[in-house]
Design a protein with these regions (language model features):
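Signature for phosphate-centric chemistry
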Residues: 1-112, 116-290, 294-399
Length: 399
């Protein structure tokens, strides 16, 4: 989790989490030079890793084998991601045959894998891929990572300064709404947290405490009884959700569209282009599956864009699946502007979602409201969010 630890909590929340044994060895990444060639040494010996801690002004201390870095993927997290990969294999390889059972090098273009640049998401995707391809894969697919400035899997205020201004506006609004409500629990939280009151913006931030509490619960670490209060936990959850994501639900429809457009508009444009390429090229398009590893901000933002947000923080390992279907009885050809006979189904975990924007007649498969027409799906996440003066997202971001 994040680095927040209530210093006076009882039972105490440990500063060091010994839950990362799978990360205690590094594959050697030192390059060897052989003439004009540069490559990895044969055998690739493993180098043990231990974490060095500093506590106040004391001399640095060496942690135990298996201690975690802040925010690091734990052993349990690795197993969870492998299980997710195995579930995807059972569904899309064994049952649907989207990929061959033993992935070979010539199948590389059928599977698109991308992660944000953070080590936790890269490691998560690596574990997922191990579960997906199975033990008999002939070839290991590559994972793509973008530089921070080019990232579109989550809102990117570095690339879009105007978005950063809007994000701060809604964070400030959340402070005005929730800090007075949180004050009700000052006597509960402050004694555990070195006298710090629970606030979104003052001193130790509430989001850090909330993250630590969720991580502790997920790993079987007991919270102080006073922090187990369901009303307190719900209030904290809603406060942090509004602080981070309030702009997606702005009451001003123009501002709401602008926020969504600048936050995840580029990502959804790319996603719809991928669907359109499949619809227009058919089997000539080699890609059969894409797996993208993002963050809570990715998942919550996507559900807001689709108007299906449940206003809960995503569980660890939560995912949103978008499946493209074709009506083989449709004979009308698909074009970039109109893609008849193609449908999108959204799945949040095992739940099939009914998108509000697809419920009108003609915007879903008759009798199957969860199957949104591809045209209607694009209208929801791209067309209706376009800038009224026709500016591109890049132009709007730098205005």
């Amino acid at each position: 989790p994040a680095g927040r630890r209530p210093p006076s909590a009882e039972p105490p929340l440990p500063h060091r989490w010994n839950l990362c044994h799978a990360s205690q060895v590094f594959g050697q990444s030192v390059m060897q030079h052989t003439g004009s060639d540069v490559g990895l040494p044969h055998g690739k010996p493993h180098i043990p890793r231990r974490i060095e801690f500093t506590v106040h002004n004391d001399a640095p201390q060496t942690g135990e084998h298996g201690d975690c870095l802040l925010g690091e993927l734990t052993d349990k997290g690795r197993k969870t991601m492998q299980h997710i990969g195995e579930a995807l294999r059972a569904r899309y390889v064994d049952a649907e045959h989207l990929l061959p059972p033993n992935l070979a090098k010539e199948d590389a273009r059928s599977l698109y894998l991308r992660s944000t640049h953070m080590s936790r998401t890269i490691q998560s995707l690596e574990e997922l891929v191990r579960g997906l391809v199975g033990p008999n894969a002939v070839s290991t697919p590559e994972i793509l990572v973008r530089n921070t400035f080019d990232e579109d899997l989550l809102p990117n205020p570095r690339k879009c300064p105007k978005l950063g201004v809007l994000m701060q506006k809604f964070a400030d609004l959340a402070v005005d709404v929730y800090n007075p409500r949180l004050a009700k629990y000052d006597d509960v939280v402050a004694p555990l947290d070195g006298g710090a009151a629970p606030r979104l913006n003052d001193g130790p931030r509430l989001s850090g405490l909330f993250d630590t509490m969720r991580s502790a619960t997920a790993h079987g670490i007991q919270l102080p009884q006073s922090l187990e209060n369901p009303e307190l936990q719900t209030l904290m959850e809603h406060a942090v959700l509004d602080e981070w994501f309030g702009g997606y639900a702005s009451r001003d429809p123009d501002e709401r569209r602008q926020y969504r457009r600048m936050a995840l508009g580029t990502f959804f444009e790319s996603l719809c282009d991928t669907f359109a390429r499949r619809a227009t090229l058919g089997d000539a398009d080699p890609r059969r599956m894409s797996i993208l590893l993002g963050h809570d901000a990715t998942l919550v933002g996507m559900t807001h864009m689709l108007d299906v947000c449940n206003h809960r923080w995503p569980a660890f390992g939560a995912g949103l699946g978008l499946e493209l279907f074709r009506d083989r009885s449709s004979t009308e050809p698909a074009t970039a502007q109109h893609m008849p006979g193609y449908y999108v189904r959204c799945r949040y975990g095992d739940e099939e979602l009914r998108l509000p924007g697809c419920q009108a007649s003609g915007k879903h498969w008759s009798g199957r409201p969860e199957l949104c027409t591809l045209d209607a799906f694009r209208e929801i996440v791209v067309d209706r969010l376009r800038h009224p003066q026709g500016l591109t997202i890049q132009q709007e971001c730098t205005m």
